[in-house]
Amino acid sequence: MSFWNTRRILVTGGAGFLGSVIVEKLKEKGCKTISVPRSKDYDLVDNDACKRIYQETKPDIVIHLAAKVGGIGANRNNPGKFFYDNAMMGIQMMEQGRVFGIEKFVALGTICAYPKFTPVPFKEANLWDGYPEETNAPYGLAKKMLLVQAQAYKQQYDFNAIYLLPVNLYGPRDNFDLETSHVIPAIIRKCLESQNSTIETEREINSAQVAISESQSCITIWGTGNPTREFLYVEDAADGIILATEKYNKTDPVNLGSGFEISIKDLVKLIVKLTNFKGKVVWDTSKPDGQPRRRLDTTKAEKEFGFKAKTRLEAGLMQTIEWYMKNKATVVC
C-alpha cells in the first residue's frame, strides 16, 4: 500500500503555481483525500479561519504552500504586508496543526532567508550567519520563523514539522503579472509582448527635436544583470517536496535546488534566444540588483530523501514559454 493511500492531505496554496502541480502528483500516487482551501473561503491570516480549516478538513498531513510572494518591486513596496501575512499564516497553521494533532506539517521556506553575503554554494548551516538581503528581508525572515517554530515544537511537544528551502521556481502556470511576478515569467512576457510594440522616440531631423512613432521593440530589465541566480523547475520542486513529506522527519532545514547558477544577463540572453526576440535590452541600473549570488548546496536533499533535479534550464524555459503562448489570453493581467 502506498504511503499516500490512506492519508488525508491538506495543501494550502494548492490551487496556485506550485500547489496545483503537487496536487496532481499526489493524485497520481493514489492519494484519495486532498483538501485545497481557497482564499475566499479561508483567510489564513485570521486564526479563526485556520482553526476552521482543520475542523472541516481533518488532515493527517499539511503541506503549507500558501504565501504572499512577489519580485523585488512588490517586496520593496509592501514590506509590512509581506512580513505580516507570511508570518501569521505559517505560525497559525502550524500551531493549529499541533493542537489538532496532525501527523506531519511541511513548511516551505525561501532562499531569501539566507544572509545577503552567504558563501556560495549556500549550505543549510549558513542560514543564521547574517542578515538577509534588505529588499527581501521581511519576507525571508517571516518564512524563517517557521523553522524556529518547527524546532521549538519538536523540542517541547515532539511535533513532527519539516522545513524545506527551495530556490526560485519557474515553469508552466507561473505568475506572469508584471507587477508581482519573478524574473523568469517577467522576462518571457516582456520579450513576447514587445516584439511588435510601438514606442515614442525622439530623433533629430533638420536640427529640430521632434517626437516620432516608429516600430521598435525594447525591453527594460532592472539592475545591472550581474547577480547570479539558481532556478528550479516546478515539476522538480513538487517531486522534492513529496519525497521529503514521505521520507524526511528531522527538524534540520533542507535546500531544494537545481545546483545550476546563471547570471541575470545570461538568463536574459537565453530567453531572448528562445523567444526569438529581436529588439533591444535596456538595463535600468537605478533599480536594485538584490542579492549578489544565489546557489544552493543540494547534497543534503539527495542524501536524506533521494531528491535530485532532472530538468535542464533551457528545456524548462522552453516548456514555460510554450505554455504561456498557449494560455496568455487567460493569464495576462
Where are these regions (language model features)?
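Conserved Rossmann-fold NAD(P)-dependent oxidoreductase catalytic core, especially the SDR/UDP-sugar
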Residues: I91-N136, I162
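Active-site Tyr-X1-5-Lys
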Residues: E134-V167, A186-S197
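C-terminal substrate-binding subdomain of Rossmann-fold SDR/epimerase-dehydratase oxidoreductases
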Residues: F17, V23-K29, E193-C333
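NAD(P)H cofactor-binding loop motif with strongest signal on the N-terminal glycine-rich segment
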Residues: G14
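Adenosine-cofactor binding site in Rossmann-like domains, unifying the SAM/SAH pocket
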Residues: K27, K32-R52
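NAD(P)H-binding glycine-rich loop region in Rossmannoid oxidoreductase-like domains
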Residues: D48-N86, Q96
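Short-chain dehydrogenase/reductase
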Residues: F83, A87, T135-L147, D177-H182, ...
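Flexible, glycine-rich beta-alpha linker
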Residues: D43, A113-P115, P138, I162-V183, ...
